[in-house]
């Protein structure tokens, strides 16, 4: 089942901020730079991917819901630290 969450990252971050986001991506478990996703390419049986949308950073994955929740919590914590602003579910 596909899990998804939109994080409160605007699509107009500066280049320096996007560089920090990219560094956080690479520090997360399962990062596959060649696919710009984690654990597998977007169409695989197990993956997490992120895309920049007008509403924020969309993170979605075909992965166990509890694993996804924990993984996204870690991603938010790392992004918060790297960017110096709180990153969380945009719909909260």
What is the predicted function of each stretch?
Residues 1-92:
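Structured alpha/beta or helical-core interaction and ligand-binding surfaces enriched in interleaved
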């Amino acid at each position: 089942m596909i899990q998804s969450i939109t994080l409160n990252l605007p699509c107009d971050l500066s280049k320096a901020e996007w560089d920090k986001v990219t560094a956080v991506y690479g520090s997360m478990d399962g990062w596959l730079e060649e696919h710009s996703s984690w654990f597998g390419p977007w169409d695989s049986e197990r993956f997490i991917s992120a895309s920049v949308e007008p509403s924020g950073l969309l993170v979605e994955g075909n992965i166990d819901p509890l694993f996804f929740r924990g993984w996204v919590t870690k991603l938010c914590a790392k992004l918060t630290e790297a960017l110096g602003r709180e990153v969380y579910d945009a719909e909260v």
